[in-house]
Amino acid sequence: MSITSVASVFKGEFAIGSQVTVRGWVRSRRDSKAGISFLAVYDGSCFDPIQGVVPNSLENYNDEILKLTAGCSVVMTGEVVDSPGKGQAFELQVSSVEVAGWVEDPDTYPMAAKRHSIEHLRELAHLRPRTNIIGAVARVRNSLSQAIHRFYHEQGFIWVSTPLITASDAEGAGEMFRVSTLDMENLPRNDEGKVDYSEDFFGKESFLTVSGQLNAETYASALSKVYTFGPTFRAENSNTSRHLAEFWMVEPEVAFADLDDVAGLAEQMLKFCFKAVLEERRDDLEFFAQRVDKTVIDRLESFVSSDFAQVDYTDAVEILKSCGKKFEYPVEWGIDLQSEHERYLAEEHFKAPVVVKNYPKDIKAFYMRLNDDGKTVAAMDVLAPGIGEIIGGAQREERLDVLDARLEEMNLSKEDYWWYRDMRRYGTVPHSGFGLGFERLVSYVTGVSNIRDVIPFPRAPKSASF
C-alpha cells in the first residue's frame, strides 16, 4: 500500500524537495496576515502532526481551506522542506488540499476543545482515539503487543488460539459470564426445578473464559513451549480503576519447566517489551512523561537495568510485619498480599522488581503444584515498582493423585475437569506458566492509572456501550 505516513516523513524517508501526499485529520488551522494558512494534520502514525504551509493562491483557499476546523479530514500534497520552527524537522509547502470530510457543526463537535478530562472521554469512546492521550496509548499498546509476539517467536514458542467459550473455570472462583441461547422469559426446567442446560446450545452450562491456561497446558504437553494472547472475562462486580470485565491476557506454558524457569522467562519478556517501547515509541513516552507521569521513562529504563529480587512469601510477610510501617490491611501469614504490601516490597524494601514465591495453598488455585511442606504451592507473583503485581504464575500440579485431592478440597468436580486430568494420565510432565494482564502492562508503561483508559472500549459493571 503506497500511502505516505506522517511518521515516515519525520523519519527522513523522503529527501528535501520530494513531493508527498499525506492523508489525515486537521488538528488545528492558523491563518497569517500574509495570506498563508498553517494546517496541523495528523494521521495517527506518530504523536506529532505535520505542518502544511498553505498559500492563498490555491483555488479552494477561500471556499474550503479557510473553513477547515479541527476534525476535518484532508488529503494534502506538498514539497518536503526543512522546518524553520521548533519542534519538528520537516514541514510541507503545500500545493493542493482536498477535503475528504467536513465536521458537520464545529460548534458541537465534542473533540473541538483543546482539553478534556479523561473521565469525560470515557463517555466518548468512539471519538477519544482522536485525542493526544488516547492516540498515544493506542500506539504504545500496539508496540507492546507486537513486542510480545516477537519475543515468543524468537524464543521458539508456538502461539495457540484458545477458546473464548468454555465449560471449565480455570480459577475456580465462579465469577464467570454465562453463555446461553435459552429464552430468558421461558427457561426450561428439570425435575428439581433447576434450569435444564441440556436444552441449551452447547448442551451444558457454558461460560466466557477467565483464562486460556488450562487449554494451553494441553498444547504444551505436545509442543513444549506455547503461549496464548487474547481476551478473557471476569464477572467480578468491582467498579475500580484496576478492574475490567473484559481484558487481554498473555499466558505462556512451558513443558519440563519449574517455577524458577518461568520466573526467568517473565523477567526476559518484560525487559524485552520495555526496551522495544523505549526505542519505538519515544515520542509518546515523552508526552506521558510531560502530561501524565514524569517518572515513566526513568521507571522503564531502571526496570530494564535492574536484576529481579526473589523472596519467599513467608519471608515477605516477616519483612512487612517488622518494617514499622502501618498498613491499611494488617499483615499475617495466610493473607493474600494487597497492593500496598506489594508496592512496599518493590519500591521501599528491595527497590527493584521482585518475585514473591511459594504462597499458602488456601489462597491459590487448584492447579498449582503442592510443595513438600503441604501448606504452600509453587506459585509466584512478579511485583513492579509503581504498580505492584504485574504477573502471576505457578508450576502446575502434574501428579494426578495430588490434583484430585486439591479438586476435592475446593469442592470442584473431577468430572468437569476429566480432560485436564487426562493430561496427568498420559505422559505427564512437570510444567509451568504465568499470566500477564496486558492492560496492567500498558498502564505501567504509560503511567495512565485507570485501566479503563488503556483499552479501546472498556467493559465494566453497568458499562457496555459502543
From Swiss-Prot:
Homodimer. GO terms for cellular component: cytoplasm. It comes from Shewanella sediminis (strain HAW-EB3). It holds the Pfam family tRNA_anti-codon. GO terms for biological process: asparaginyl-tRNA aminoacylation. One of its GO terms (molecular function) is asparagine-tRNA ligase activity. Gene3D superfamilies: Bira Bifunctional Protein, Domain 2, Nucleic acid-binding proteins. Disulfide bonds: none annotated. Its EC number is 6.1.1.22. This is Asparagine--tRNA ligase. NCBIfam families: asnS, PRK03932.1. Keywords: Aminoacyl-tRNA synthetase, ATP-binding, Cytoplasm, Ligase, Nucleotide-binding, Protein biosynthesis. Transmembrane segments: none annotated. It is found in: Cytoplasm.
